[in-house]
From Swiss-Prot:
It catalyses: UDP-N-acetyl-alpha-D-muramate + NADP(+) = UDP-N-acetyl-3-O-(1-carboxyvinyl)-alpha-D-glucosamine + NADPH + H(+). Its EC number is 1.3.1.98. It is an enzyme of class 1 (oxidoreductase). The lineage of its organism: Bacteria, Pseudomonadati, Pseudomonadota, Gammaproteobacteria, Moraxellales. Residues 42-212 form the FAD-binding PCMH-type domain. Pfam families: FAD_binding_4, MurB_C. It comes from Psychrobacter sp. (strain PRwf-1). Its main location: cytoplasm. Its cofactor is FAD. This is UDP-N-acetylenolpyruvoylglucosamine reductase. Pathway: Cell wall biogenesis; peptidoglycan biosynthesis. The gene is murB. Cell wall formation. Gene3D superfamilies: 3.30.465.10, UDP-N-acetylenolpyruvoylglucosamine reductase, C-terminal domain (3.90.78.10), Uridine Diphospho-n-acetylenolpyruvylglucosamine Reductase, domain 2 (3.30.43.10).
Amino acid sequence: MCPSFHTTASVTTASNQADSDFNLAKLITAPAQLLAHNTMRLSCQAMQLITLEQEAQVEPAIAKLKEGDAPLFVLSGGSNVILPKQLQAQVLHPVFKGIEVLAEDEHSVSLEVMGGENWHELVLYTVNNGWYGLENLALIPGLVGASPVQNIGAYGVQLEDCLTHIKAFHLPTQKWHDFDKADCQFNYRDSLFKQQAGQWLITRVGFKLHKDATQVNADYGDVACLALSLAQADNRSAIGPIDVMHAIIDIRQSKLPDPAVLPNCGSFFKNPIIGTEQFAQLQHEYPGIVGYRVDEAHTKVAAGWLIDTAGLKGQGINPILTHAKQALVLVNHSALDSTTPASQADILATQQFIQRSIKDKFGIELEREPVWVDEQASYTAAP
């Protein structure tokens, strides 16, 4: 059921002003090949692509598009979706940009960021301005508007830690809504927007960031050690958020392939959460197993460690293989050395091969992280 929230007056006014001279045809590419619009570089032919350059275009565009029978599908940066060969849908591609300071004092700053802004560029912008909290999320691909859907996270930080509010358009009812953080129902790699996939177009995301350069989160992996070496190279004895950001960028660049060079959609599997008792049993058999206590009863296990330990790094079913340096990432080799683009079926073959292998060896079920889209633009949890 859709939560009930008040319409944003400023957004509604902007939309109404655009109605009189709105020309939908200027925004449409038809038919549209989406190969360049998804980081896995899967060939996907859609009915049409509607590029929304201004927030004021959202309401009139959707009103006109819904006069037809074809479903609507929101495609942001395309970094977390597995697309079909044919997509019988009208694809909405929001690219509007802008960053506004809503409030600021000596301790913090509140921002509102348009959904078309590049996520990593936002992280760089905030840290370089002395606004901290997003630095651990550096180099995550995609756009700001898609970040809440998956509640993106990395190196001990999740988006929800800094998020304050969201403005979004509900496609089924064609109404604007404001969400506080609590309304978003965030969980590990999950949110209301993911649970109600395909129903929302997020246009603005609000953040509250701090200005305390001594407050860092560097307890994850090798971040602290590398961040300290960066600080010392700059003649500083204590690490700051900028050191954490650059350390994470260095780590990610050393382990993760650039989607522009070797197509991928980032971490393909979620880190599974298992019972602490099961983890203790596995730890007895595999002393090097990597896990992080969630609570007294549950431990989160590093999926990459499981895949690597199972001997699956660099393995899979051509042309989709796990990356040679980071087993958690599936890469599409067909984009480099084949005239035949990879398909959903190719990805599914490698996905299920890895899932079976991990289940057989460790008794753990791996869950896919990117969302699966069928030809009718429906998001599916399976296969």
